[in-house]
Amino acid sequence: MTTRYIFVTGGVVSSLGKGIAAASLAAILEARGLNVTIMKLDPYINLDPGTMSPTQHGEVFVTEDGAETDLDLGHYERFIRTKMNRRNNFTTGRIYSEVLRKERRGDYLGATIQVIPHITNAIKEKVLDGGEGHDVAIVEIGGTVGDIESLPFLESIRQLGVELGRERTLFMHLTLVPFLGAAGEVKTKPTQHSVKELRSIGIAPDVLVCRGDRAIPANEKAKISLFCNVEERAVISLKDVDSIYKIPALLKAQGLDELVTKRFGIECKEADLHEWEQVIYQEANPTGDVTIGMVGKYIELPDAYKSVNEALKHAGLFNRVSVNIKYIDSQTVEAKGEEVLEGLDGILVPGGFGERGVEGKIFAAKYARENNLPYFGICLGMQVALIEFARHVAGLEGAHSTEFQKETPHPVVGLITEWLNEDGNVEQRHETSDLGGTMRLGAQLCHLEEGTKAAAAYQANTCVERHRHRYEVNNNYKDRLEKAGLVFSGLSSDRQLVEMIELPNHPWFVAGQFHPEFTSTPRDGQPLFVGFVAAAAAHQKRDLG
């Protein structure tokens, strides 16, 4: 199979939405019957985002094979059917690490290691490897043209453009075309300068996607085409929209997919965007709304919970309701108690690390349990629910996780020291292990207990979800917690680890050790999120009734 490559760069400012644009183009090409994948090349020195602060970088998206990756890979999976893996995201740090490891082994036979050719060759190998087996590979370059950090990546894709030729490569550049209120017009000069910067390093863009708060007039498109040496039909206007799922249709309406397929000489069917039209219709026509309180510690940056936010919206589509998310700092819950939890239709406690605010999360679980308020716990959200139940129902005073209190009298949650991976291999970690890359990561099979809400949600006796954690339920307390009324509704493939818990006599008190948000899409939803939002809508009706 001959893979074609589309390289996506950004200029003028950061946060233009390269990832959304790349994913939207991929969605159209997939709708034309093509096998598409997307890669993200990140210019930072970290090996991966695994140990980066969520308030700086946003969430860490976990792939099926256990890679800790950039949140843009979540966008990719929500827009196309192709599942991402560790080949779809790599950083400057990872490239340098691998090159230096080869140098230590003597693979370069004593050569002087340089950015060109050794680093650029390593980048090219990663890109070609990631695209193998697909009709089209879209490669997003992180950062902004002009940043010193991005230069090795830009040089690498420049070389690939020469080596693979125009028949197999296309360069798409996102720029900002701002509207100046005082002048009453859009300004194209930033775009011209951005393209000039890109051309100065040897890359001539084939397509310009011009971002702005409004559509770009035809005369301004012609001006951009003239001064940037790009065909006028290849100047695409991408205005701000109220839903990212409208973007595939916007790009298709301007013929971007047709331009790409003709450039590559690919004969394929017309794009059928019916599924996306259905998503947009459901989003625009809810029959009601619910308010979900998300109790977390990284709420100052909503992108820290990006996949959770999107999964709640997807669940709203399947329940025909609009989901309003109220972000609640768990430390505020510690200070003010139930005052900040009143008026909610459901409480969700997402994953997280560290002791700060954990008692607020435990209080939120207690409030939901005692007030029959739908509760959904994810990862740490499951652990705090179990701790709360142990303390206040099972009579285990002082129960806690050893992550937060080493000398707790009842360590109901403890460090996992050994577990089976999906391939059957044993993974191990200890108290002194590195933080990075030492968690239970990736897709794991979960056995669901018959007659539970979990099994009813999935309509199956097993599920496969993705994990990212170091701590688990202490099996020494299972019998006592079960006798107190807690149901262990999901167990690991070897039935040694607790994956899900729930309360049987509660409208919806369900929690999982895994991260179901990573598998939610607008077209398919995710069973637990759909069930949780349905319970929240039912709770609201009971209150109104």
Curated annotation (Swiss-Prot):
- What CDD domains would the database entry show? CTPS_N, GATase1_CTP_Synthase
Give positions of region: Amidoligase domain.
1-266
> Which residues belong to any copy of the Glutamine amidotransferase type-1 domain?
291-542
Q: Which pathway is recorded for this entry?
A: Pyrimidine metabolism; CTP biosynthesis via de novo pathway; CTP from UDP: step 2/2
Detail which positions bind Mg(2+). Answer: 72, 140
User: Listed disulfide bonds for this chain?
Assistant: none
In which residues is ATP bound?
Answer: 15-20, 72, 239-241
Check the record and name the PANTHER family matching this protein. Answer: CTP SYNTHASE, CTP SYNTHASE-RELATED
Q: Where does L-glutamine bind?
A: 352, 380-383, 403, 470
Tell me the InterPro entries matching this sequence. Answer: Class_I_gatase-like, CTP_synthase, CTP_synthase_N, GATASE, GATase1_CTP_Synthase, P-loop_NTPase
The family database entries (HAMAP family) matched by this protein are listed as: PyrG (MF_01227)
Write down the EC number. Answer: 6.3.4.2
What assembly does the database describe for this protein?
Answer: Homotetramer.
Report the active site residues: 379 (nucleophile), 515, 517
State the family named in the UniProt similarity comment for this chain: Belongs to the CTP synthase family.
A GO-annotated cellular component: cytosol
State what inhibits or activates this protein: Allosterically activated by GTP, when glutamine is the substrate; GTP has no effect on the reaction when ammonia is the substrate. The allosteric effector GTP functions by stabilizing the protein conformation that binds the tetrahedral intermediate(s) formed during glutamine hydrolysis. Inhibited by the product CTP, via allosteric rather than competitive inhibition.
Q: Which GO terms describe its biological process?
A: 'de novo' CTP biosynthetic process; pyrimidine nucleobase biosynthetic process
Q: What is this protein called?
A: CTP synthase
Binding positions (CTP)? 14, 147-149, 187-192, 223
Question: One GO molecular function term?
Answer: metal ion binding
- Group of enzyme by EC: ligase
Q: What else is known?
A: CTPSs have evolved a hybrid strategy for distinguishing between UTP and CTP. The overlapping regions of the product feedback inhibitory and substrate sites recognize a common feature in both compounds, the triphosphate moiety. To differentiate isosteric substrate and product pyrimidine rings, an additional pocket far from the expected kinase/ligase catalytic site, specifically recognizes the cytosine and ribose portions of the product inhibitor.
